[in-house]
Every structure is written in structure tokens, then in C-alpha cells.
């Protein structure tokens, strides 16, 4: 298990923290090779891996399955795992069972929970039970129906003040980090100024401790239109489609496989296959 200490030292030294989502073994290996500071096994896997319209259908089983693969691919990187929709609502006993399963079976270093209010009490109790937690405020995708779509949060004074209050309460509840999603840059900056824990932004501007983006978004891999806050660093949609098309063409026209891609046999054995006669 990894601790927050190296990450906090980087924050204190003024070094930005870099978080990236990962959902399987190869994405985790690439992320660790690229020297990201943290990995997030997000319930966004429901969208980008499983093809769901939202994260609502993602289960604890899904999170455990994918997080175990990520841990195998990136054993040296701090890994945060989302608690999926409805797994931390209702009785605390049920929440504890789900959290403990994810934590134990996946090798998670921290669990991420969306929302404020009663969720902060859950964060406090899980922390007391020995499971570090990350809070997630602003746009919370599991509650997007209540929030009336994917919209910037905290745009009014009242909403901004509530977000600040919730952020302070999250730190007081024991959250080790705070993810702020889709909030105005100046508001995110003010939140980071008021907190001692790292604020990791996604669509929250540059004046926070670090940034998180989705693996498939920065690589333009299997995704469509990108959100405003995403910067693409590759175009795997185009390069991947072109590569597959070339493979199809080579097989169809007989140029693949070539002799270099094939395994040979001794001529006598070949003759034996043809009853001793090779035409």
C-alpha cells in the first residue's frame, strides 16, 4: 500500500500532481511508464470501456475487476478507486462492506466518493475504519440527473459559497484529497487556498494542486467530441482506424502474412505430410 506522504511532499515543494484514469492492465502500464503521480480507476469505465450511457450501471464487481487489473499494471503508483453509484448510500454497514471489498481485493490506496452532506460523514467513518478517502465535489457525474446535465457548478455566489463550505467540511471529515470538477477557475483557486489537502482539478483551472483527465480523452481513443477542459495529446481514433484498415487490406489482397510471419518445417516432414510426395 502506498501512502500520501510522497504526494504531499511534492505539493509542498510546489510540484503539480498528475492524475490519470486507468481501467485495465495496458493503460496502467503506459500511465506508470509515463510517470503519472496517481491513477484513478474511475466509474467512468462505464462510459469508455463498457459502453453505458452513464456511470449509474457500474457495480462494485466492475470496479473490483478493473482495479485489480490496474494494480497489476501499475504496482508502484498510488491508486484511487471510485465507489460506484448507490454503493455508499443507505446503511453504513452496507457501505462498509462494499468499501472493504474494493479496498481489500483491488489493492486500492484510497477510495473516492462523490458529494457532500451525509457523504462526508461516510468519509469520516471510512477513514476511521482505516480506508483513506478522496472527496469529489462540483460536477458529480453520479448525480448528473439531479444537477440537470453536465454543467459548470458554483457559478452563483450562493453556489460558490456552498462549494467552499463543502470543501472545508470534506477536509475536516478526513478526506486526503479533493477532486473538483467543472467549476470556475477563480473558485477552484480559492478552494485550494483555503485547504491544506491537495485539490485535483478537472475543468477547474490551473491554480490547484494537480490535474486529472480521462485516459481515453487525452489519447482520443474510442471517444467522440471532447469536453472543453480536455487537451488531446494523440489521435488514436485516426491512427488506430487506419492501422486496422491496412490490416484488413493486407489480408484481403494476400500480402499478409508474409514468409517472415510464418513458421517453417523440415522438407522431409513436409513430404511426409503429402504421403512422401510433394508436388
Swiss-Prot record:
Localization (cell): Cytoplasm
CDD domains cross-referenced by the UniProt entry: KPHMT-like (cd06557)
Cofactor: Mg(2+)
Major localisation: cytoplasm
Binding annotation for Mg(2+): 43, 82, 114
GO molecular function terms listed in the Swiss-Prot or TrEMBL record: 3-methyl-2-oxobutanoate hydroxymethyltransferase activity; magnesium ion binding
The EC number(s) this enzyme carries: 2.1.2.11
Record field: catalytic activity: 3-methyl-2-oxobutanoate + (6R)-5,10-methylene-5,6,7,8-tetrahydrofolate + H2O = 2-dehydropantoate + (6S)-5,6,7,8-tetrahydrofolate
Active site location: 181
Cysteine disulfide links: none
Alphabetical GO biological process terms: pantothenate biosynthetic process
Task performed by this protein: Catalyzes the reversible reaction in which hydroxymethyl group from 5,10-methylenetetrahydrofolate is transferred onto alpha-ketoisovalerate to form ketopantoate.
Oligomer status and interactors: Homodecamer; pentamer of dimers.
The name this protein goes by in its record: 3-methyl-2-oxobutanoate hydroxymethyltransferase
Amino acid at each position: 500500500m502506498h501512502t500520501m506522504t510522497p504526494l504531499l511532499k511534492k505539493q509542498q515543494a510546489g510540484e503539480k500532481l498528475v492524475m490519470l484514469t486507468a481501467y485495465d492492465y495496458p493503460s496502467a502500464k503506459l500511465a506508470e511508464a509515463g510517470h503519472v503521480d496517481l491513477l484513478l480507476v474511475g466509474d467512468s469505465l462505464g462510459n469508455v470501456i463498457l459502453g453505458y450511457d452513464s456511470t449509474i450501471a457500474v457495480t462494485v464487481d466492475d470496479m473490483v475487476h478493473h482495479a485489480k487489473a490496474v494494480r497489476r499494471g501499475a504496482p508502484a503508483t498510488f491508486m484511487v478507486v471510485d465507489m460506484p453509484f448507490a454503493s455508499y448510500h443507505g446503511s453504513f454497514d452496507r457501505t462498509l462492506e462494499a468499501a472493504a471489498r474494493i479496498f481489500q481485493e483491488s489493492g486500492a490506496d484510497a477510495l473516492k466518493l462523490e458529494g457532500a452532506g451525509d457523504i462526508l460523514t461516510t468519509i469520516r467513518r471510512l477513514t476511521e475504519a482505516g480506508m483513506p478517502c478522496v472527496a469529489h465535489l462540483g460536477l458529480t457525474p453520479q448525480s448528473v440527473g439531479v444537477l440537470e446535465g453536465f454543467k459548470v457548478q458554483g457559478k452563483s455566489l450562493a453556489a460558490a459559497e456552498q462549494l467552499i463550505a463543502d470543501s472545508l467540511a470534506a477536509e475536516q471529515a478526513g478526506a486526503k484529497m479533493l477532486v473538483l470538477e467543472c467549476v470556475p477557475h477563480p473558485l477552484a483557486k480559492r478552494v485550494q487556498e483555503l485547504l491544506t489537502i491537495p485539490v485535483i482539478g478537472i475543468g477547474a483551472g490551473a491554480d490547484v494542486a494537480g490535474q486529472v483527465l480521462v485516459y481515453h480523452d487525452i489519447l482520443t481513443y474510442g471517444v467522440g467530441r471532447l469536453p472543453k477542459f480536455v487537451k488531446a495529446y494523440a489521435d488514436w481514433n485516426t491512427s488506430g482506424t487506419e492501422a486496422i484498415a491496412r490490416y484488413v487490406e493486407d489480408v484481403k489482397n494476400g500480402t499478409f502474412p508474409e514468409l517472415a510471419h510464418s513458421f517453417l518445417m523440415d522438407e522431409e516432414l513436409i513430404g511426409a505430410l503429402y504421403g512422401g510426395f510433394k508436388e
